[in-house]
Curated annotation (Swiss-Prot):
NCBIfam families: PRK00766.1 (NF001977)
Organism: Thermococcus sibiricus (strain DSM 12597 / MM 739)
Domain of life where this protein originates: Archaea
Record family assignment: Belongs to the UPF0215 family.
Protein's name according to its UniProt entry: UPF0215 protein TSIB_1161
Length: 195
């Protein structure tokens, strides 16, 4: 739990790079980028790892990136959803526990969990495990009606909303996530994609 939220709170925001349908078949990898910022203003650094498309290593790679980084004063982990590289689902409870930090999941469009579960059951032998991870993320809260949603682990909803607002700059998406998205898409496709 966070006692006091400062405007320059150290946040790491993770997003993944693009990948093709062919990547899904071959189980290729895509990049995972974590952008470390002080609030919404100063970029402090960037961490990267490679994760398997539709794999099971996103959680482990995030934990590894944080533990092996020089950024020891991080206070919050932000995720742009909990599915990375297709259906490489993050175990947000494990991520929070192993890093000893709260996790805030920011979502632009409210996910259709039933459709996700149906797709998982149709295409994955480990569907039940992935579905369980989806539900571990907790209740989906609406921050901006029809435009921005979030989930919070290890931090109150009020604090999560305050942190989201503190880290927004020129977009509804918090700046660490927006920049992670731009960097990851540029690495994978040669140029950044619009958020």
């Amino acid at each position: 739990m966070i006692r006091k939220i400062k405007p320059q709170i150290r946040v790491i925001g993770f997003d993944d790079g693009t990948f093709s349908f062919k990547s899904k078949i071959k189980r290729d990898k895509t990049i995972l980028v974590g952008v470390v910022m002080k609030g919404s203003q100063d970029v402090v650094g960037v961490v990267t790892r490679w994760i398997e498309v539709d794999g099971r290593d996103a959680t482990e790679k995030m934990i590894e990136a944080i533990h092996n980084s020089r950024f020891k004063d991080l206070r919050i982990i932000m995720l742009k959803g909990i599915t990375y590289a297709g259906f490489n689902v993050v175990d947000v409870e494990e991520l929070s526990r192993e890093t000893r930090m709260p996790v805030i999941i920011v979502i632009r469009k409210k996910p259709d969990l039933q459709a996700m579960e149906k797709a998982l059951k149709k295409h994955f032998s480990d569907a039940e495990e992935k579905i369980s991870l989806l539900h571990k993320a907790g209740k989906i809260k609406e921050l901006i009606p029809g435009k921005l949603y979030y989930q919070a682990i290890g931090v109150s909803y009020d604090q999560a909303e305050e942190i989201i607002r503190l880290t927004q700059k020129s977009s509804l998406i918090p700046e660490p996530l927006r920049l992670a998205h731009m960097i990851a898409s540029a690495v994978m496709s040669g140029e950044s994609k619009k958020e």
